[in-house]
């Protein structure tokens, strides 16, 4: 495997917080190649006390299977991908909307 194919985990972030009467978890993982381009990512919002399936993942975006996907409450749909920052912005916006629904 040449250095151009070697991936480096650039971001590995996880935080827990109180949400909707239980502990929620936000997870962000990003892998980059030798040119610092994002080649793999996983964004997940977990509320296991509200949604027990899919390891508690209420919302997520990833490209784990070579396809860009959005996961929501067990449903999976393919999504258009332009660049990682746009996908991350969309994810965090949706997390905010979901949190507001449960906190109102």
Q: Each predicted region: which residue ranges?
A:
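Short, compact, well-ordered microdomains
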Residues: 74-104
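The feature represents the first ordered module of a protein
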Residues: 1-69
